[in-house]
From Swiss-Prot:
Its cofactor is FMN. FMN binds at A61, G62, L63, D64, K65, T85, N139, N172, K217, T245, G268, G297, Y318, S319. Pathway: Pyrimidine metabolism; UMP biosynthesis via de novo pathway; orotate from (S)-dihydroorotate (quinone route): step 1/1. It comes from Xanthomonas euvesicatoria pv. vesicatoria (strain 85-10). The gene is pyrD. It is a peripheral membrane protein. It catalyses: (S)-dihydroorotate + a quinone = orotate + a quinol. Transmembrane segments: none annotated. This is Dihydroorotate dehydrogenase (quinone). Its main location: membrane. The lineage of its organism: Bacteria, Pseudomonadati, Pseudomonadota, Gammaproteobacteria, Lysobacterales. Monomer. It is found in: Cell membrane. One of its GO terms (biological process) is 'de novo' UMP biosynthetic process.
């Protein structure tokens, strides 16, 4: 079905096609025809962060920024859906056009800039959702006009608002599309921010009667020394998990494309190798008690297996859905199932 719709979607501006695809998924959900888009995979229960995921394949943050399509997305067969990035106050993001497809490379460049309706709107949408079929992650960020010195207050405010509703919370400090945001990954800044948020997490756990896992999403552009420093901080502060990785600002593998000079984060197939290297290095340097989610460049079941082989407990797709459609979900689940059933399925590939 998606193969028939793709030529029309690709004839549209990328952001307009994005919105139309979401409306189509909603329509399929309301009319009970989601099965025409994707066959729900057989469950493959997967433990991580003290939770049991129905299957290990999730939706990465960015597709549903405001939590407006949660039930329709779960119906496609995701084991978990991550919504956001959401900020305390609504913001428009960067000027359009701000999303570009590179079909020759099965890639996307975006400079959305955390466009969202604000955390209160997201909370209202989540409260209305039925949320059947999977677990819900909520990805939080800071407003673009909040200085880094005050970033903790933005993240804390979002955490307090979404805590009762989230199955896990992701702290996004790695988007390249908010000026200065990635500076929060520097060792001392990271330690201050995550220490404060870990304290907030523990304070919130008592009144809500539950401890919601807190994950940190990192960039693929960190050098080895930065990765080692980040791993040191995240291990010291005992975060619940790490998502590796966000989009990249490098253009090495798409340098000859006419859109390569567009500012923003590159995602899709060219990111697979770079993001998987970061994932593997983090797995080698973090304790096994901190699970990893592998994201970046997954366009096939084999790509998902590569993430698992590098040490991921779960994987997420996003740009791959643009090129492959919802069938990618079941393909990834089934590939991971076959790997799990193989005699060497638990091995992590060496550095």
């Amino acid at each position: 079905m998606y193969s028939l719709a793709r030529p029309f979607l690709f004839s549209l501006d990328a952001e307009r096609a994005h919105a139309l695809a979401l409306r189509s998924i909603d329509t399929a959900y309301r009319t009970g025809t989601t099965a025409l888009l994707a066959r729900r995979p057989v469950p493959l229960p997967t433990p991580a962060f003290g939770l049991i995921f129905p299957n290990p394949v999730g939706l990465g943050a960015g597709l549903d920024k405001n939590g407006e399509h949660i039930d329709a997305l779960f119906a496609l067969g995701f084991g978990f859906v991550e919504i956001g990035t959401v900020t305390p106050r609504a913001q428009e993001g960067n000027p359009k056009p701000r999303m570009f497809r590179l079909p020759e490379y099965q890639a996307v460049i975006n400079r959305m800039g955390f466009n969202n309706l604000g955390v209160d709107a997201l909370v209202a949408n989540v409260q209305r959702a039925r949320r059947t079929g999977g677990l819900l992650g909520i990805n939080i960020g800071k407003n673009k006009d909040t200085p880094n010195e005050e970033a903790t207050s933005d993240y804390r405010y979002c955490m307090e608002r979404v805590y009762p509703l989230a199955d896990y919370i992701t702290v996004n400090i790695s988007s390249p599309n908010t000026a200065g945001l990635r500076e929060l990954q520097e060792e001392q800044s990271l330690r201050r921010l995550i220490s404060d948020l870990r304290e907030t997490q523990e304070v919130l756990s008592a009144p809500h009667g539950k401890r919601v896992p807190m994950l940190v999403k990192v960039a693929p552009d960190l050098n080895d020394r930065d990765i080692d420093a980040a791993a040191r901080v995240l291990a010291d502060l005992a975060v619940d998990g790490v998502i590796a990785t966000n989009t990249t600002v490098t253009r090495t593998l798409v340098a000859n494309h006419p859109l390569a000079a567009e500012a923003g984060g590159l995602s899709g197939a060219p990111l697979l190798g770079q993001s998987t290297l970061v994932l593997r290095r983090l797995r080698a340097r973090l304790p096994e008690s901190i699970p990893l989610i592998g994201v970046g460049g997954i366009n096939s079941g084999a790509d998902a297996v590569a993430k698992m082989a590098a040490g991921a407990s779960l994987v997420q797709c996003y740009s791959g859905l643009v090129y492959r459609g919802p069938q990618l979900i079941g393909e990834c689940v089934n590939a991971i199932r076959r790997r799990r059933e193989a005699p060497s399925g638990g091995a992590v590939s060496p550095l």
